[in-house]
């Protein structure tokens, strides 16, 4: 059963930036820490004169799949939506 939850809430992210690539390690949302095990997809959406990069992330320990967005202008992260893996 598909139970998508749209939230559009800010999150704190620990990521590794290298060679124009962003590797998300984990993020904090509502005082919970979510370890990112895998990134399934990445795409960019124009936003003003810059763009936002969106990621589909799998958090196996939390049984969650989610969409995260990174705004390259203000360097802020947002949790767009999430769902359970099962």
Predicted region positions:
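N- and C-terminal low-complexity/disordered segments
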Residues: 1-86
């Amino acid at each position: 059963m598909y139970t998508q939850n749209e939230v559009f809430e800010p999150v704190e992210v620990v990521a590794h930036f290298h060679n124009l690539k962003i590797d998300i390690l984990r993020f904090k949302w509502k005082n919970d820490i979510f370890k990112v095990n895998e990134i399934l997809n990445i795409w960019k959406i124009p936003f003003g004169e810059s763009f936002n990069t969106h990621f589909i992330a799998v958090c196996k320990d939390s049984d969650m799949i989610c969409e995260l967005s990174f705004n390259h202008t203000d360097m802020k992260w947002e949790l767009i939506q999430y769902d359970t893996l099962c």
